[in-house]
A protein has these predicted regions:
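Extended, compositionally simple hydrophobic/Ser/Thr-rich segments
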Residues: 45-57, 102-104, 109-238
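Short acidic/polar N-terminal linker immediately downstream of export determinants
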Residues: 2-12, 20-74, 85-105, 121, ...
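Short, ordered coil/turn segments that flank beta-strands lining enzyme active or ligand-binding pockets
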Residues: 82
Length: 238
């Protein structure tokens, strides 16, 4: 019995030594150290953010960026602008016990790219000419907007709930992603789905669908429909 216990201790020590030599890092959890931080950045109309952030975006005449969460996570943030895009990431990769949330105020919005299991909410932007939305890595979004042209790219089991009003919609869904847009009526829509993705949309004039890999489209309205289906994919009226 003693020999077995000694052997287990030796194995554990060797494992920890190996992990340390490989640069493995674990979070020092400890108690929550709540804090907030503002970033004095301006002149951006696009967002590129990851790292499982919770993100709220709202319109306003002045730029404002507020981050809230655990002080250790806030100290690790890398937030900057380049060519009209606001970027936000952590400098170091590690498991994190506590959530970091961003509240971003900006005059107008042209596009967002959210990744890494982020959760986002956008509301209040109207009369946009074109809006690009990209969600990846199991990210979730709830957007209430108005745009003439809306371009969507959802991948990696991401989910978007879209409401408001649009004229034209282009969407590329892959990897079991989901678009819920019954509350976002458009005149024309062009959809490309693969990998068991799903889309619910409202269309009045024309609907073009390319679906593969057991994907599914449900639509409301009476548009003219062109469809190319493979791999047990389906198109249904709602």
């Amino acid at each position: 019995m003693k020999r077995t216990t000694f052997f287990q201790l030796i194995c554990t020590a060797l494992l920890l030594t190996g992990l340390s030599s490989c640069g493995w890092r674990r979070e020092d959890i400890g108690p929550f150290q709540g804090d907030q931080q503002t970033f004095e950045l301006a002149n951006f109309d696009r967002l590129d953010m990851g790292s499982a952030f919770t993100i709220t975006v709202q319109p306003g005449s002045a730029f404002r960026i507020l981050a809230e969460g655990d002080r250790r996570n806030l100290d690790d943030l890398d937030v900057y602008t380049r060519n009209g895009t606001l970027y936000a990431r952590y400098r170091n990769s590690r498991n994190r016990q506590y959530e970091t949330s961003f509240t971003i105020t900006m005059p107008t919005l042209r596009g967002v790219s959210f990744s890494g299991a982020s959760q986002s909410s956008i509301a209040g932007f109207t009369n946009l000419n074109e809006l690009d939305i990209e969600l990846s890595g199991a990210s979730k979004g709830q957007f209430a907007v108005q745009a003439k042209q809306t371009n969507l790219t959802l991948s990696g089991a991401s989910n978007l709930q879209l409401s408001g009003l649009g004229a034209a919609l282009g969407a590329d869904l892959s990897g079991a992603s989901t678009l819920q847009a019954f509350a976002y009526p458009v005149n024309d829509a062009n959809l490309d789905l693969s990998g068991a993705s799903k889309a619910n949309i409202s269309v009045s004039s024309s609907l073009d669908i390319d679906a593969s890999g057991a994907s599914n489209v449900r639509y409301r309205g009476a548009p003219s429909v062109k469809q190319r289906l493979s791999g047990s994919s389906s198109v249904q009226t709602d």
